[in-house]
């Protein structure tokens, strides 16, 4: 492959950066970088009613967070209508397009009749071969492509193979609306040509659009980019991905505590593989990525795998980076003291073992916040309410007399208390853990005790 490869990511700014769109952007980015090419960004904002500035910013921030930095200036379709209009008029002048004056109501009537008769609807305009002397003066026309009435179009797809569509199944699509604005089909083709796009990688829901776009490419005499239509992401149940499956925006995954490196790795493995490799960091992905290793079957979103992968990436971070990320979350609602930061740092490895996301990590780190009351989970509250108060008094008395308060000494004392009360160690630790951490599952209580110290531990063992 030459270094002239140019790919593009072309979202419509009508909402958040969807997880499926993020994967499309990732594949385009990796293919471009693998071939020393360019990855371009185009905002398809011709739908003025649905496009929002907030959605544009969400796309920008989502891509930047994932590390998918684009080359060159962002292209906004809303600023290029003069270019589209000029292109449509060119086809009109060459006899490859025509003015159509048929009212939309009439077209809808024909569509409904075809539906009632269970027929495939293709609009055939009576204006296709009319001359200007027959044009009505009181109706603003649209400009339609004069699609060849015979022959076929072949989509040469690197993944789907050759897909042949007969021209008789392609209508004379509108290129320019009656208000002078371009349609999606025209804008995409003009932009891809103008931007020098060599490869189009997108979801296979665009496969039906491909034939119509190729018809426009052919009318202009443009070179058709190499196309790859990838299967969409499905939910764990095999159904089309929706919000109930977790079809959220990239920003939501960030807020849920996923790392961008982890999410990119996970999305890469959704529909692409490199042997049995699971952990693939960005530099390795750029080196390995190719279109030949794309899968033909829809990939399924699996949060268990996503969480497992994220926990791996958490453990790859250095201590200072982890502390910084934990504090970013905790400091939203609480000012963490230097002493508490030191506690968290000392207990970090114990927290990591039980964490899959940054939110898990931050939640567990609250164990080491000594200047606020312990936040008790409902199960912990129930355990405390039903615990043997005399047993807790024995624990307090045993810990008070300890001269050394390291984890070994604390553990030995708990073993003695358990034996003295004819209990198993975990029977003693269950209410103690609930009181000290507010949780039913936590890192080692013995380690927590050593880190927090006798005074803080005894304070937490006071049953209110």
Swiss-Prot record:
Chief localization: cytoplasm
Reaction equation(s) it catalyzes: tRNA(Glu) + L-glutamate + ATP = L-glutamyl-tRNA(Glu) + AMP + diphosphate
The keyword Zinc is annotated on this UniProt entry: no
Motif position, 'HIGH' region: 11-21
Database matches in Pfam families: Anticodon_2, tRNA-synt_1c
Functional description taken from the UniProt entry: Catalyzes the attachment of glutamate to tRNA(Glu) in a two-step reaction: glutamate is first activated by ATP to form Glu-AMP and then transferred to the acceptor end of tRNA(Glu).
GO annotation terms (biological process): glutamyl-tRNA aminoacylation
Protein name: Glutamate--tRNA ligase 2
Location of this chain's protein in the cell: Cytoplasm
Keyword Zinc-finger: no
Keywords, ordered alphabetically: Aminoacyl-tRNA synthetase, ATP-binding, Cytoplasm, Ligase, Nucleotide-binding, Protein biosynthesis
Protein residues bound to ATP: 243
GO CC annotation, single: cytosol
EC number: 6.1.1.17
Gene this chain is encoded by: gltX2
InterPro entries: aa-tRNA-synth_I_cd-bd (IPR045462), aa-tRNA-synth_I_codon-bd_sub2 (IPR020751), aa_tRNA-synth_I_cd-bd_sf (IPR008925), Glu-tRNA-ligase_bac/mito (IPR004527), Glu/Gln-tRNA-synth (IPR000924), Glu/Gln-tRNA-synth_Ib_cat-dom (IPR020058), GluQ/Sye (IPR049940), GluRS_core (IPR033910)
Motif 'KMSKS' region, residue range(s) on this chain: 240-244
Single GO MF descriptor: glutamate-tRNA ligase activity
């Amino acid at each position: 492959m030459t270094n002239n490869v140019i790919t593009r990511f072309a979202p419509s700014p009508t909402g958040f950066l969807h997880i499926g769109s993020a994967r499309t952007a990732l594949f385009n980015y990796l293919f471009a970088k693998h071939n020393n090419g360019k990855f371009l960004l185009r905002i398809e904002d011709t739908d003025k009613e649905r496009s929002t500035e907030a959605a544009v910013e969400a796309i920008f921030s989502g891509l930047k967070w994932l590390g998918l930095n684009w080359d060159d200036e962002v292209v906004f379709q809303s600023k290029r209508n003069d270019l589209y209009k000029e292109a449509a008029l060119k086809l009109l002048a060459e006899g490859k397009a025509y003015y159509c004056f048929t009212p939309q109501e009439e077209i809808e009537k024909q569509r409904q009749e075809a539906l009632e008769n269970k027929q495939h609807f293709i609009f055939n305009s009576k204006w296709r071969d009319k001359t200007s002397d027959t044009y009505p003066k009181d109706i603003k026309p649209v400009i339609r492509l004069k699609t060849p009435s015979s022959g076929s179009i072949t989509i040469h797809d690197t993944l789907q193979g050759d897909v042949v569509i007969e021209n008789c199944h392609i209508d004379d699509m509108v290129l320019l609306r009656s208000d002078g604005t371009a349609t999606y089909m025209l804008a995409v083709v003009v932009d891809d040509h103008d931007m020098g796009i060599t490869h189009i990688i997108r979801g296979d829901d665009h496969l039906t659009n491909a034939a119509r776009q190729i018809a426009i490419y052919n009318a202009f005499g443009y070179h058709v980019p190499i196309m790859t239509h990838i299967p969409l992401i499905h939910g764990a149940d095999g159904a089309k991905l929706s919000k109930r499956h977790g079809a959220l925006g990239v920003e939501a995954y960030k807020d849920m505590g996923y790392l961008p490196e982890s999410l990119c790795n996970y999305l890469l493995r959704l529909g692409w593989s490199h042997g049995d490799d699971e952990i693939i960091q960005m530099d390795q992905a750029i080196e390995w990525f190719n279109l030949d290793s794309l899968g033909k079957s829809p990939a399924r979103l699996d949060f268990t795998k996503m969480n497992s992968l994220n926990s791996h990436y958490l453990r790859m971070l250095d201590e200072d980076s982890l502390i910084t990320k934990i504090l970013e979350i905790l400091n939203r609602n609480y000012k963490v003291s230097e002493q508490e930061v030191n506690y968290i740092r000392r207990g970090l490895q114990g927290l990591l073992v039980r964490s899959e996301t940054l939110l898990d990590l931050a939640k567990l780190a609250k164990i080491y916040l000594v200047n606020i009351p312990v936040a008790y989970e409902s199960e912990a509250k129930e355990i405390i309410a039903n615990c043997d108060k005399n047993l807790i008094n024995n624990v307090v008395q045993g810990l008070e007399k300890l001269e050394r308060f390291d984890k070994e000494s604390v553990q030995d004392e708990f073993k003695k208390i358990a034996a003295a009360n004819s209990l198993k160690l975990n029977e003693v630790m269950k209410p103690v853990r609930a009181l000290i951490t507010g949780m039913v599952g936590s890192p080692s209580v013995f380690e927590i005790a050593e880190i927090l110290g006798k005074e803080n531990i005894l304070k937490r063992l006071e049953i209110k």
